[in-house]
Amino acid sequence: MAQDVTYSSYLDLDRILAAQHPVSGAHDEMLFIIVHQASELWLKLCLHELFAARDCIAADNLRPSFKMLSRVARAQTQLIQSWDVLSTMTPHDYSQIRPHLGRSSGFQSPQYRMMEFLLGGRNPDMVAMHEPTPEIATALREELARTSLYDEAIRLLSRRGFAIPDEVLARKLDEVWVRSEEVEAAWAEIYRDPQQHWDLYELAEKLVDLEYHFQRWRFGHLKTVERIIGFKRGTGGTKGVPYLEGVLKQAFFPELLSVRTAI
């Protein structure tokens, strides 16, 4: 019954606060664990909102999606700020923890990968690392078979009468998005006359917000890694900073960036 619910029981705090298990004996390991666990909770919220927003866009019901996408952008700022907390860890602090991490890495976060896939940053090869956990690998493959958030936005443009090529609408969903001049032209028409296409204009700006904050998060990740471990390889086997620099060049919604030059 509701009157029996307490703050702790509703939030399941006993389990949440008992989920930190430092193994190194280092003081800073608690910080390391909590920052990553908190980030996973924010990612869970982002996914919750993005899945719902995608459904709204597919149904041409944009107004609720704007609130959802705005909420994701706010949650992303929390993810970005988490690097400020983690960066209080020095190279010496991290060196006491790293030997206990094995090959575990944030690169292996299934929720991060799901968010990339959902936004449109798709690479089927990234599922392989999750094969030891079949339910996660299955969920990621199922997402690759669905339209991404950006695919749904482009399909909406087509339904609204914009000239989107058939090859764009029928593209393989599990492949990386390839920039389209016709898609850029559609966005350019919207940006040149926002009053005529206000809801699509607002959708475009909400998507740009997501891209902007995601890139800020990636940049924060890069600079935090650079500050703490320099140019060592990552625990997950990546090249560390050089890998993160390469990721910064990847865009989810390329036409929404290039259209700024076009107009």
UniProtKB/Swiss-Prot annotation:
Its cofactor is heme. It catalyses: L-tryptophan + O2 = N-formyl-L-kynurenine. Binds 1 heme group per subunit. Keywords: Dioxygenase, Heme, Iron, Metal-binding, Oxidoreductase, Tryptophan catabolism. It holds the Pfam family Trp_dioxygenase. GO terms for biological process: L-tryptophan catabolic process to acetyl-CoA; L-tryptophan catabolic process to kynurenine. It comes from the Bacteria. Belongs to the tryptophan 2,3-dioxygenase family. Heme-dependent dioxygenase that catalyzes the oxidative cleavage of the L-tryptophan (L-Trp) pyrrole ring and converts L-tryptophan to N-formyl-L-kynurenine. Catalyzes the oxidative cleavage of the indole moiety. HAMAP family: T23O. This is Tryptophan 2,3-dioxygenase.
